[in-house]
């Protein structure tokens, strides 16, 4: 019999393909269904809309499901629950039941999830025996709405239309798939066959094509996709029956291909494949349309005879068909499958568990193992013998209670899902759908009269649930109730028949269509003769005697009837449903990851503190890196009783110098390496000498510290080369102390403690400053003079018990200890101890000088000068006192001239030149024109300002009337705010624009992700979190782009010379850099925290949810990403964590405390910005949430940044030789080096300098203002030693000066722009320099006089310059005095006016100031206006400048000007005072305005 069947098939193939071949240019039917209908190419294609055969029924008419309808689960329990095992009265076999699933999967897949996921909840009745066994009433069955066309669902005229992801044609997509890549993965490309794994079976899914692979509910875990067979439909491995049909059709294709190849060996692989595919499709079309459909609907219902192809007929799957009618076969599916052995004997197999049938609920998504265990033959034979369930409303529990679901809800209800699918698709109610198909409406009683009679209570309950209104009855419920023993009811029959008719008539490639030229009439008749039985026999080892003629039905007399009607009795029980969260096992990783991220900045801060403390602990700092105790000196060894040792003296944290320590008898001397005493300490009889030294082996690099304390003076802190030197040093101290009975106390301490306790000269000075501030606050009764951080009252023992020495008093007054004025004042004041002065003693005398009447002050001065106590003062003693004051003030006149000036002053007061003594009356006459209350100086606050007589002559340039000076009220908040806005209007505008752009970018992205991005599931999963983080990302990208522009120093320098400089305050580029950095830190923090929350939500999502969230990513079907995956296994996660770490490192080491103490670390960590930008670019590349946009933000700034660096390299000058260097007072360093020929700059600009001789970390350079004029041949810099690098440079220069060795070479970059370079843009300019801030004006003033004294004067716009120099004492700036002398000598008459404000007298004695005024006034009057202090014509002022009065004077002097430039360089408080003065002056709208440019150090 087998041979007869093979012969028959061979004849069939010979008949069909014997007379012609398939040409290469012949049209092959597409896999995706497109262009089947040439007029409507998308009809029936994969991804096309479902066909709407009746109007949609949504509660809002657009897309909303009617939530007022009864619970789908409750309907399922009432109507579809029942006993299984009732045989089908028509004799339908299980083959028909499972083949209906093949047909459904062949033509539709409309339950795919849509993005965003729309999950509805099906309410479970209380105490449901499957889903609510504990009677909690909280369980809800999840239902996910189907994928739909995004172009629909937007209005009443365009209701939501779901999508069919399969083709509507019967075209073999169940076997081949719907895409070319999918088909290619299935083919062997040999002889037209589909690829095989083992013979007769397709390969397993090692290539991981996207087959459906949900977690089998019976094991409740994800399984590897490698175990699944690869076939055309992704759902084919769902159950054993479905997979068996898939394998049958797979073999049918290869069987056909073999036959065709045998007949036509010359055909190509593609020709054979397409020919075999044609026959497979044709045979499926015939079996489905003419065998299956009548079998399902009943023999009396058949499709009409085929007439012709009808291109106007839409083949699309209708909503009513897919969501209701074609779900009727659920009622005939049995709970288990019989397994029948091959052979002539009628034997059935028990499954491996000993159960008589294979339970369906226990084998979801395990079909491949069943097939391999029992074979396709046994499954097919079992289904052929097994009678299906009866055609009724009952659905077995394997489908109704235990069908597979997602992992978080492992079992679902297929009936409830079908009801919800109809509602989701907008299928109209039962009666309305009947009217659409020309059927009369039904009532509750007539819907199924037999059912109503038998189950009246159920119908009544149903009626109650729908409120008695049958107009709301779901079509699926009504259609299922219509059915009976003869199959589906009339509504479902009409829908199914209509659907298959449209599919057939609208298919251009239908096998009966004569116009497509595929088959002849004879070939069509031959195809009509093919049955499913023929295909089974051709593809299995089943003999024809084992199968009935019609495998869809089992009739009496057919071979091997079933032994029993399968029901749930005696079968393997179903594993109950389980609920779980996808967050399981993620808690620990998530919590510890967040803790780790939070600890990153703390760790960075800890590392920074460790670096700083370690340097302190081992006494290591950059100032002593290159210094050792091994240096040459004039007296290296001990001479006689003199002990000597080389050491390093630790003066302050960033300054260490080489010294020679010598101990002779009871004196310890600190000397310079080549001679010269720096300090002497004498040990007194009975003195307690305290010594602290480092613990043994404190540092292998430098050796131990020694601290020697001294009362009323700063400690001596030295570092010896070794512990051996330390031992010898201590022995010498003990020996010196033993001779005078002094007690020596020696203790060892850790370096960090020792250095922190050391009262260095700097720390002692801070304490003295506090001492004097508090005393002045008491004396002047002015709380503003107090330390803002120290609270002082009369009970503060720490201050009251403080004493100062004569040397410290002299230093505070700016005098020397041997100064006559100091000696006399100290002798008169120190009453309890001749060596020290207490706080109360100092306060008493201070009050006398400040608050006492003028008469009492003169008496005090008279007592100081009356050394003999005879109530008269020796003329020469008073002369010596005045001479000491002049010497302190730095008077630049000889002693003879001073004596002449002194005699002139006395003569002016009426004292005879012959008088040897002066009486008190002479003193009174001498100071008669001095006010009783004279201000200390010109304070910044401008309160109660009245120029004194002495000041008036010195302040004649400022003699203006100020209406508000005498009656100025305290500044209100509004006044301060308005002054700030007036001063910083450009800055405020720029910052406002910056903030506005940040907010616009943030809210644009926020709005987009919160309200617009509906095609993703972001909003449902993450809520506002994703909107916040994406908004922060947009603003952060902008900040990171902008921050690059703020450091393009070379480009900024070029822009300063353009009109842009008038609108953008480039002076504040670094300040703006910090503002942008703070905003970036805020956005980055918000972004990071937001995503930490977001990824928690991501970790709770199913695979479908993740597919919607991350549409650009692909996850394996057996892979559910954990939180550790997101954090540590994705580019986004890893780069995100790396970015947090890098950003924390950069920001932490950019804190001022680390910049000051660990500058190298700051420089190095800022190089991580390169990695920061690279990581940020990588961060967005995976496109998890959106396409990366960071590159669009930064591409322009990066290009400009690179151009800026190229310009910088072009302006990089290496190994410049220092030709001259000096160490000036106040720790100022002067260097002069050769100017490169091509180096051009403007006065007021600055350069960055580094030196290869100073061992610094990579790329360290420091900025300094240029002191030389553009016309000079050499470059000059004046550098204040304040940090590690400058102190190290100072030490190197000292070494070179002492040893005569070459100066260190330097590298230079620049020049860079500065606000001071704009002075030439104004006709009137005001320049204010304070401290080392006068450096840029050394260049500017020289440039000014050289320009104005040359023939090109007419090219210089500037016509008047006011220069104000604010300094504590000009003695420390002799170099600048020389510059001013040179400027005065060359300046054109009237172009430059200079004022010098000496602030050291502020908080000092007004008596001293008064005497200086008197001498200065008389000297100027007799020496052509030259100052006796400076030798300059510049006016001297004792106190601080009153900028408000000065600016008002300038406005009155230059009314014709519209704008006047103000340039300042100095400390913050100076610039703030100038800015405030400018703001006040700018309120005068009819006067010139002031434009302030400043530099702060």
Swiss-Prot record:
UniProt keyword terms in alphabetical order: Calcium, FAD, Flavoprotein, Glycoprotein, Hydrogen peroxide, Membrane, NADP, Oxidoreductase, Peroxidase, Repeat, Signal, Transmembrane, Transmembrane helix
Tissue expression as described in the entry: Expressed in hypodermal cells.
Topological category with respect to the lipid bilayer: Multi-pass membrane protein
GO molecular function: calcium ion binding; heme binding; NAD(P)H oxidase H2O2-forming activity; NADH oxidase H202-forming activity; NADPH oxidase H202-forming activity; peroxidase activity; superoxide-generating NAD(P)H oxidase activity
Residue ranges annotated for the Ferric oxidoreductase domain, each copy included: 1030-1210
Extracellular side: 22-587, 1008-1024, 1090-1134, 1185-1189
CDD domains found in the cross-reference section: dual_peroxidase_like (cd09820), NOX_Duox_like_FAD_NADP (cd06186)
Segments for region (Peroxidase-like): 26-590
Cell location: Membrane
Signal peptide: 1-21
Catalysis: reaction(s): NADH + O2 + H(+) = H2O2 + NAD(+); NADPH + O2 + H(+) = H2O2 + NADP(+)
Bilayer-spanning residue ranges: 588-608, 987-1007, 1025-1045, 1069-1089, 1135-1155, 1164-1184, 1190-1210
Impact when changing residue 1263 to T: In mac40; blistered cuticle phenotype in some animals with blisters containing cellular material. Resistant to iodide toxicity
Domain EF-hand as annotated: residue spans: 817-852, 853-888
Gene3D superfamilies: EF-hand (1.10.238.10), Haem peroxidase domain superfamily, animal type (1.10.640.10), Nucleotide-binding domain of ferredoxin-NADP reductase (FNR) module (3.40.50.80), Translation factors (2.40.30.10)
Keyword Glycoprotein assigned: yes
One Pfam family hit: NAD_binding_6
Summary of activators and inhibitors of this protein: Peroxidase activity is inhibited by aminobenzohydrazide.
Membrane side Cytoplasmic: residue ranges: 609-986, 1046-1068, 1156-1163, 1211-1497
Domain FAD-binding FR-type: 1211-1318
Oligomer status and interactors: Interacts with doxa-1 and tsp-15. Interacts with rho-1.
Protein name: Dual oxidase 1
Protein source organism: Caenorhabditis elegans
Upper lineage: Eukaryota, Metazoa, Ecdysozoa, Nematoda, Chromadorea
């Amino acid at each position: 019999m087998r041979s007869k069947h093979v012969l028959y098939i061979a004849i069939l193939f010979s008949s069909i393909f014997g007379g012609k071949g398939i040409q290469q240019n012949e049209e092959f039917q597409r896999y995706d269904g497109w262009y089947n209908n040439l007029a409507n190419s998308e009809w029936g294609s994969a991804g096309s809309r479902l066909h709407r055969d009746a109007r949609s029924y949504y509660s809002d008419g657009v897309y909303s499901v009617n939530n007022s309808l009864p619970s789908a689960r409750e309907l399922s329990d009432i109507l579809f629950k029942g006993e299984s095992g009732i045989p089908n009265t028509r004799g339908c076999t299980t083959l028909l039941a499972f083949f209906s699933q093949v047909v459904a999967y062949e033509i539709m897949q409309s339950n795919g999830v849509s993005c965003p996921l729309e999950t509805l909840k099906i309410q479970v009745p209380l105490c449901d025996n499957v889903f609510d066994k504990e009677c909690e009433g909280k369980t809800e069955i999840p239902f996910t709405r189907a994928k739909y066309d995004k172009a629909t669902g937007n209005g009443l005229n365009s209701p939501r239309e779901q999508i069919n992801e399969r083709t509507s044609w019967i075209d073999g997509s169940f076997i081949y798939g719907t895409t070319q890549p999918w088909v290619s993965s299935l083919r062997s490309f040999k002889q037209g066959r589909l690829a095989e794994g083992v013979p007769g079976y397709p390969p397993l899914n090692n290539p991981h094509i996207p087959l459906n692979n949900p977690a089998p509910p019976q094991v409740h875990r994800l399984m590897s996709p490698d175990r699944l067979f690869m076939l055309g439909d992704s759902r084919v491995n769902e159950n054993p029956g479905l997979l068996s049909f898939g394998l049958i059709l797979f073999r049918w294709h290869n069987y056909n291909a073999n036959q065709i190849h045998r007949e036509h060996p010359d055909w190509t692989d593609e020709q054979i494949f397409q020919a075999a595919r044609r026959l497979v499709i044709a045979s499926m079309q015939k079996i489905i349309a003419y065998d299956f459909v009548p079998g399902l609907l009943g023999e009396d219902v058949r499709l009409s005879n085929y007439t012709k192809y009808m291109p106007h007929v839409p083949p699309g799957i209708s909503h009513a068909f897919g969501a209701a009618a074609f779900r009727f076969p659920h009622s005939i599916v049995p709970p288990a499958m019989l397994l029948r052995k091959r052979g002539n004997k009628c034997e059935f197999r028990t499954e491996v568990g000993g159960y008589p049938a294979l339970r369906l609920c226990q084998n979801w998504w395990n079909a491949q193992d069943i097939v391999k265990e029992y074979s396709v033959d046994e499954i097919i034979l079992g289904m052929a013998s097994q009678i299906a369930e009866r055609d009724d409303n009952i659905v077995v529990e394997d489908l109704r209670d235990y069908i597979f679901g997602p992992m978080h809800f492992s079992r679902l209800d297929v009936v409830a899902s079908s009801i919800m699918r109809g509602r989701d698709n907008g299928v109209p109610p039962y009666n309305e759908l009947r009217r659409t198909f020309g059927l009369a409406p039904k009532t509750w009683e007539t819907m199924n009269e037999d059912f109503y009679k038998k189950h009246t209570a159920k119908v009544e309950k149903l009626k109650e649930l729908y409120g008695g209104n049958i107009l709301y009855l779901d079509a699926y419920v009504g259609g299922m109730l219509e059915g009976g023993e003869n199959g589906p009811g009339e509504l479902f029959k009409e829908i199914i028949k209509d659907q298959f008719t449209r599919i057939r008539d609208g298919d251009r490639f239908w096998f009966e269509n004569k116009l497509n030229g595929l088959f002849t009439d004879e070939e069509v008749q031959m195809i009509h003769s093919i049955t499913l039985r023929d295909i089974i026999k051709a593809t299995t080892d089943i003999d024809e005697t084992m199968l009935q003629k019609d495998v869809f039905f089992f009739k009496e007399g057919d071979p091997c009837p079933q032994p029993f009607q399968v029901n749930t009795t005696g079968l393997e029980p179903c594993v109950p449903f389980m609920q779980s969260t996808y967050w399981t096992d993620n808690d620990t990783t998530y919590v510890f990851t967040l803790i780790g991220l939070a600890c990153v900045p703390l760790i960075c801060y800890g590392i920074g503190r460790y670096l700083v403390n370690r340097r302190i602990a081992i006494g290591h700092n950059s100032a002593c890196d290159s210094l050792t105790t091994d240096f040459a000196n004039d007296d290296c060894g001990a001479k006689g009783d003199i002990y000597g040792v080389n050491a390093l003296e630790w003066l302050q944290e960033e300054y260490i110098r080489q010294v020679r320590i010598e101990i002779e008898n009871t004196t310890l001397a600190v000397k310079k390496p080549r001679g010269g005493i720096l300090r002497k300490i004498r040990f007194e009889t009975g003195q307690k000498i305290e010594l602290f030294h480092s613990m043994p082996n404190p540092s292998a690099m430098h050796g131990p510290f020694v601290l020697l304390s001294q009362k009323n003076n700063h400690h001596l802190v030295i570092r010896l080369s070794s512990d051996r030197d330390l031992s010898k040093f201590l022995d010498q101290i003990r020996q010196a102390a033993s001779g005078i009975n002094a007690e020596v106390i020696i203790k060892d301490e850790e370096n960090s403690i020792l250095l922190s306790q050391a009262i260095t000269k700097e720390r002692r000075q801070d304490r003295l400053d506090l001492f004097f501030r508090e005393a002045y606050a008491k004396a002047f009764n002015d709380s503003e003079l107090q330390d803002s951080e120290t609270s002082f009252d009369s009970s503060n023992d720490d201050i009251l018990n403080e004493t100062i020495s004569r040397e410290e008093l002299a230093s505070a007054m700016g005098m020397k200890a041997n100064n006559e004025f100091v000696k006399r004042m100290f002798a008169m004041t120190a009453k309890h101890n001749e060596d020290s002065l207490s706080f109360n003693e100092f306060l008493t005398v201070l009050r006398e000088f400040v608050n006492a009447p003028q008469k009492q002050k003169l008496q005090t001065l008279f007592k100081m000068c009356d050394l003999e106590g005879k109530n008269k003062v020796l003329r020469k003693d008073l002369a010596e006192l005045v001479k000491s004051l002049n010497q302190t003030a730095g008077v630049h006149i000889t002693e003879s001239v001073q004596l002449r000036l002194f005699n002139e002053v006395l003569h002016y007061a009426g004292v005879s030149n012959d008088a040897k003594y002066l009486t008190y009356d002479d003193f009174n006459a001498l100071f008669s024109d001095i006010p009783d209350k004279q201000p200390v100086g010109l304070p910044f606050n401008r309160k109660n300002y009245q120029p004194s007589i002495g000041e008036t002559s010195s302040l004649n340039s400022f003699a203006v009337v100020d209406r508000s000076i005498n009656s100025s009220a305290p500044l209100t908040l509004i006044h301060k705010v308005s002054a700030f806005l007036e001063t910083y209007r450009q800055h405020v505008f720029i910052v406002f624009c910056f903030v506005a752009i940040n907010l616009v970018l943030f809210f644009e992205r926020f709005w987009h992700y919160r309200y617009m991005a509906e095609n993703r599931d972001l909003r449902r999963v993450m809520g506002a979190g994703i909107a916040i983080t994406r908004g922060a990302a947009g603003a952060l990208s902008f900040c990171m782009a902008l921050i690059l522009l703020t450091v393009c120093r070379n480009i900024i320098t070029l822009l300063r010379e353009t009109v842009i400089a008038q609108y953008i305050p480039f002076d504040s580029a670094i300040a703006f850099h910090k503002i942008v950095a703070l905003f970036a830190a805020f956005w980055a923090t918000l972004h990071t925290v937001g995503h930490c929350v977001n990824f928690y939500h991501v970790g709770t999502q199913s695979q479908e949810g993740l597919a919607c969230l991350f549409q650009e990513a692909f996850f394996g079907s057996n892979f559910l990403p954990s939180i550790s995956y997101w954090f540590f296994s994705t580019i986004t996660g890893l780069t995100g964590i790396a970015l947090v770490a890098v950003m924390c490192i950069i920001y932490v080491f950019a804190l001022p405390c680390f910049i000051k103490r660990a500058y190298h670390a700051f420089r190095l960590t800022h190089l991580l910005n390169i990695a920061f930008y690279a990581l940020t670019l990588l961060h967005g590349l995976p496109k998890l949430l959106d396409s990366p946009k960071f590159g669009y933000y930064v591409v322009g700034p990066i290009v400009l940044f690179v151009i800026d660096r190229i310009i910088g390299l072009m302006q990089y000058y290496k190994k410049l030789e220092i030709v001259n260097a000096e160490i000036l007072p106040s720790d100022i360093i002067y260097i002069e080096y050769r100017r490169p020929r091509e180096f051009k700059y403007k006065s007021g600009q600055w350069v960055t300098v580094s030196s290869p001789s100073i061992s610094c970390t990579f790329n360290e350079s420091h900025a300094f203002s240029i002191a030389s004029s553009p016309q000079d041949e050499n470059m000059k810099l004046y550098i204040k030693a304040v940090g590690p690098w400058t102190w190290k440079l100072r030490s190197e220069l000292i070494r070179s000066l002492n040893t005569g060795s070459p100066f260190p070479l330097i590298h230079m970059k620049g020049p860079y722009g500065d606000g001071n370079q704009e002075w030439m843009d104004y006709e009137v300019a005001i320049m204010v320099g304070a401290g080392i801030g006068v450096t840029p004006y050394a260049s500017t003033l020289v440039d000014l006089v050289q320009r104005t004294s040359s023939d090109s004067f007419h090219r210089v716009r500037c016509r008047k310059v006011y220069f104000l120099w604010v300094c504590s004492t000009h003695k420390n700036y002799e170099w600048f005095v020389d510059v001013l002398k040179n400027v005065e000598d060359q300046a054109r008459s009237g172009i430059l006016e200079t004022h010098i404000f000496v602030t050291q007298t502020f908080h000092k004695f007004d008596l001293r100031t008064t005497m200086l005024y008197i001498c200065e006034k008389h000297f100027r009057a007799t020496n052509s206006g030259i100052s006796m202090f400076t030798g300059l014509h510049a006016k001297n002022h004792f106190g601080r400048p009153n900028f408000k009065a000065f600016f008002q004077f300038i406005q009155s002097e230059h009314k014709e000007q519209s704008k006047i430039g103000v340039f300042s360089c100095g400390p913050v408080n100076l610039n703030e005072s100038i800015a405030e003065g400018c703001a006040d002056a700018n309120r005068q709208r009819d006067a010139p305005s002031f434009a302030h440019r400043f530099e702060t150090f």
